[in-house]
Swiss-Prot record:
Family: Belongs to the MnmA/TRMU family.
Gene Ontology MF annotations: ATP binding; tRNA binding; tRNA-uridine 2-sulfurtransferase activity
Binding residues annotated for ATP, in chain numbering: G22, M23, S24, G25, G26, V27, D28, S29, M48, G138
Repressor keyword on record: no
Native organism: Shewanella amazonensis (strain ATCC BAA-1098 / SB2B)
A cellular component annotation (GO) from this entry: cytoplasm
Gene3D superfamilies according to UniProt: Adenine nucleotide alpha hydrolases-like domains, HUPs, Translation factors
Enzyme Commission code: 2.8.1.13
CDD domains the UniProt entry points to: MnmA_TRMU-like
Function of the molecule: Catalyzes the 2-thiolation of uridine at the wobble position (U34) of tRNA, leading to the formation of s(2)U34.
Taxonomic classification: Bacteria, Pseudomonadati, Pseudomonadota, Gammaproteobacteria, Alteromonadales
Name of the protein described by the UniProt record: tRNA-specific 2-thiouridylase MnmA
Transmembrane segments annotated in the record for this chain: none
Compartments where located: Cytoplasm
Main location: cytoplasm
């Protein structure tokens, strides 16, 4: 479907199809449920609880989100189911998150949540318990059927496109999923919600990592991983400060280093250019294009391709090494089934091991993998 509206014939055809919408209590899933109902589908909601907060945890908004999701479903006249995936989330997302930080890498738990929870555990529950034909989410992506396979495309709203977070989906999973708001710009989504009297129309978008909520990242991480303070050094080996733990820092970071006004240095800001895990040293240098911060390419492993085949050896495509980044033109060299070497057309700053590299051919999200090592020269 390439539109948010449906013809009478499409509405009639859709009327026999049951869609389970992941209701988060936000505006995007609210409007997704409304649009699917308008398109004639049998729509029901499913609210996931993925994190078990304790009684003193004032940061997790799960109870408020559930209340908002219920209010929207009541307004739309659809049933809301609830499910607790906290155990699956802990085992498959949170433990991975901690292990990566412990290893000095910078993971993206939202990508792992989509892979293990929203499009695996959720889809299985919708199939086995709720007898779904499709699931639907409020993600800003699109789908297109081509040659018997379903492709995933960037969302219409370039500022909100979330294909970066969904690259681990297979074409089979994409074929079972509907993404109504992917055809819209965000202001239009809010306008529809307000017109339909949905309580979530002006609700603030959620940001950051869901299980951390509004609390400080450093405080949260310290409750699970012991901090190991160490020295901050320049590339020349001069000690210019102390850090509270390498896990609190990422390549390219500028703020929160606690250094500045150094003798014999210019006024350029300091950036993290390396993390020496063996010596527990944070290496910093001045200037956002310092040679230690730049990479000519990278090795990417743990590959996943939406169509299960991926690009050809030597393909010239584009890549994002972080969310909302401009596309980076690149050439791909296949090393083996789970590893590729990627050469950028121009050097790129602050490419970060542990983060995801996601590849595109025009509007089509091809898939991606985890950045393993960097190519410096």
């Amino acid at each position: 479907m390439t539109s948010t509206t449906a013809s009478p014939a499409e509405i009639a055809a859709n009327s026999s199809k049951k869609v389970i919408v992941g209701m988060s209590g936000g505006v995007d899933s609210s409007v997704s449920a409304y649009l699917l109902k308008q398109q004639g589908y049998q729509v029901e909601g499913l609210f996931m609880k993925n994190w078990e907060e304790d009684d003193t945890d004032e940061y997790c908004a799960a109870a408020e989100d559930l209340k908002d999701a219920q209010a929207v479903c009541d307004k739309l006249g659809i049933k809301l189911h609830t499910v607790n995936f906290a155990a699956e989330y802990w085992d498959n997302v949170f433990e991975y998150f901690l292990a990566e930080y412990k290893a000095g890498r910078t993971p993206n738990p939202d990508i792992m949540c989509n892979k293990e929870i929203k499009f695996k555990a959720f889809l299985e529950f919708a199939d086995d318990i709720l007898d779904a034909d499709y699931i639907a989410m409020g993600h800003y992506v699109r789908r297109r059927d081509t040659d018997g396979k379903t492709e995933m495309l960037r969302g219409i709203d370039g500022n909100k496109d979330q294909s970066y977070f969904l690259y681990t989906l297979s074409h089979e999973q994409v074929a079972r999923s509907l993404f109504p708001v992917g055809e819209l710009e965000k202001p239009e989504v809010r306008r529809i919600a307000e017109e339909q009297g949905l309580i979530t129309h002006d609700k603030k978008d959620s940001t950051g990592i869901c299980f951390i909520g509004e609390r400080k990242f450093k405080d949260f991480l310290a409750t699970y991983l012991p901090a190991q303070p160490g020295n901050i050094e320049t590339p020349e080996g001069d000690i210019i400060g102390r850090h509270e733990g390498l896990m609190y820092h990422t390549l390219g970071q500028r703020k929160g280093l606690g250094i500045g006004g150094m003798k014999n240095s210019n006024d350029d800001p300091w950036y993290v250019v390396d993390k020496d895990m063996a010596r527990n040293v944070l290496v910093v240098a001045q200037g956002h294009e310092h040679p230690r911060l730049m990479s000519k390419g990278m090795r990417v492993n743990q590959l996943h391709w939406v169509d299960r085949t991926g690009p050809a050896d030597g393909a010239t495509i584009s890549v994002k090494t972080r969310y909302r980044q401009q596309d980076i033109p690149c050439t791909v060299k296949i090393i083996d089934e789970q590893t590729i070497e990627v050469l950028f057309d121009e050097p790129v700053a602050a490419v970060t091991p542990g983060q995801s590299a996601v590849f595109y051919d025009g509007e089509v999200c091809l898939g991606g993998g985890i950045i393993d090592t960097l190519i410096k020269d």
